[in-house]
From Swiss-Prot:
SMART domains: PX (SM00312), RUN (SM00593). Residues 445-460 have a biased composition (Low complexity). Residues 37-181 form the RUN domain. Keywords: Coiled coil, Phosphoprotein. It comes from Bos taurus. Pfam families: PX, RUN. Residues 658-781 form the PX domain. InterPro entries: PX_dom, PX_dom_sf, Run_dom, Run_dom_sf, RUN_SNX29, SNX29_PX. This is Sorting nexin-29. Residues 347-358 have a biased composition (Acidic residues). Belongs to the sorting nexin family. Residues 466-546 form a coiled coil. The modification Phosphothreonine is found at T643.
Amino acid sequence: MSGTQNNDMKRQFLLERLLDAVKQCQIRFGGRKEIASDSDSRVTCLCAQFEAVLQHGLKRSRGLALTAAAIKQAAGFASKTETEPVFWFYVKEVLSKHELQRFHALRHIASDVGRGRAWLRCALNENSLERYLHMLLADRGRLSTFYEDWAFVMDEERSSMLPTMAAGLNSILFAINIDNKDLNGQSKFAPTVSDLLKESTQNVTSLLKESTQGVSSLFREITASSAVSILSRAEQETDPLPVVSKHVSADAKCKRERKKKKKVTNIISFDDEEDEQSSGDVFKKIPGAGESSEENSDRSSINIMSAFESPFGPNSNGSQGSNSWKIDSLSLNGEFGYQKLDVKSIDDEDADENEDDVCGSMPGRKRPGHSESPEKPLDAGTCLSQMHGWAPLQVLHGHAEVLFPVSGVGSYGPADAPLGSLENGTGPEDHILPEPGPRYSVEASPPGQESPLSSLLPSASVPESMTVSDLRQAIVAMMNRKDELEEENRSLRNLLDGEMEHSAALRQEVDTLKRKVAEQEERHVTKVQALARENEVLKVQLKKYVGAVQMLKREGQTAEVVPNLWNIDGEVTVPEQKPGEVAEELTSSYERKLIEVAEMHGELIEFNERLHRALVAKEALVSQMRQELIDLRGPVPGDLSQTSEDQSLSDFEISNRALINVWIPSVFLRGKAANAFHVYQVYIRIKDDEWNVYRRYAEFRTLHHKLQNKYPQVRAFNFPPKKAIGNKDAKFVEERRKQLQTYLRSVMNKVIQAVPEFTASPQKETLTQLMPFFVDITPPGDALTKNSRPKVASRFPKLARGHPRETRNVEPQSGDL
């Protein structure tokens, strides 16, 4: 796949990730119902995606700028992140002076990376990201100055979507902390030696494993990379090169393929006299060399060039293919020089234990002589995990940094010593092939002796212990690996949160659909049952129709056959039968009869519906008129619920009942302020006799207690209770008047049912004998004034005694309704 296609796929991948992050934030925080803070993984993912888009394709600094940055980093004055280009360099071009001062004044932000991240989060908080993106993308000439042609922001089609996505985030209320030291990325200052030693002693095993994994991933990168040769001499091409063959077992190959490439820390190592004394002579000068190792060390700070070749394939003798590295030395002033190299070895205890199980013990090698070929490969049992013990070599190559483990060729060492670790001193574990010529060999460490943990720490008594430089490199590699794992963990967690939300939405949608389906099924079942009942009714009706048609058929045949049997002379004649005509006539007659019956049935159904509607309307009218009659004339004698079910008996009972009406039309307030009380006017009419009585509430209560003793059914009547406070309120008095009127009407109906003598001859005297409550005697002290009578008479003109009375007909008049 070409580089253009790779860049296009990368841009599309960044766009999809950014769209997904924006969508997740809109789903979670849309509508400003909840504040979006940086504690939420969705907001963190959104910021990370915007940073990746703006960081993509930034031009890197070249030449002396890169060299100066690398020297600052190696000296511990700057972190690696400051040598990388950041989008803050371009963003600050469009910011005003006050905005720049604002971001430079942040207390906890001390790097350009942190200022860029703080600007992005501030733009999200203030809903100004859309405006900034329009400003950033407006000037294409300025963009080309800071970004490569294949950068995301240089793609007009995709970059035009950035302001649109930023506008979609305006509905979210962000509250992100911009003055946070975590935005700086890595620490600005290099860690001290005491801090490094303290951290290393806490978890040495984990530290060594992480660092060795980083080195092994570096070897895979170097193996996969193409060969590079810079300033190589023609004489060096003819020199024999040492080839190290590494045989990887099937399990180790699978493990290598599964591992993801890791980012390797790039640090330039500058040697001094103390390092020379502690590490010893690693590379020996061959006879004829005109320069010392110290002179070469001084020159190595000026230019250090290496040529790597990665040949693959089987050997000429048919053995298994091996990955080999060939390193040509640099010739200075016509003479071969030697670099001053830092080569350390770290043995991983866990890796050694696993190698004992997988690879087994490794046999020793014979000591090669001058007649043996220097390209003799290692034994085939060497596993990939054995290379985890190699320490990285820092080499500055152009504007890229590479780590590479080597050991000097030409050093001494016994052949029978195990390939344990590559040491800088004169220890017996160094396995070096002496061979004249400026070249280096790369060898792997077998699972040999396990070094104790104490040997990994700096100690004056143990010359093979780790130095501060080794520990610093291992810890930095471990920290980089830790950052990578944390970033990967955050991205996976963001994806997991998104999938969980998606699955929850799907589950909710499924539940909703299930409820809808259940409701539809219930409606369908009800409809099917109704249709089944209707079908049964139609079947019964069809049977009736068929029976009626058959009956008509039999009657028609009898009527047609009998007259034709006799002619005029009285002789019996047999008519000629035509089967075809008879069948047609029968069929047509059946059809006519069936149509007539169907029409009759339809008319009956329509007539029935019309009668039902008319009956309902009449019932409503009767109920309304009855209520109006009760309001105008008082209660109708008797209760319909107490009448007989037989309609004839019910009519007889109603016609023979006594017509007694009771009202409480008004209430009067008597007495003075302290002793005021209400008097209720009770109007009674029995046929043509009418009179009024005036009673207080206490008298109604006494009547109720007496009737309870005489008629137990009276207990079920609704009698208004006594009220001590607020009993003179107008609304309360009106409500009590209605309740007392209903109560008296119920009592009169009960008396009519219980006393047949009164029902036979309803008169005033009989009623007053049964119930002295209705005696027309004004209580002492409650005599009404003359002014009160005319008022009552004016409200009820027909109820006044002095009013001339007309003769009432027995039949009810229209005015009575």
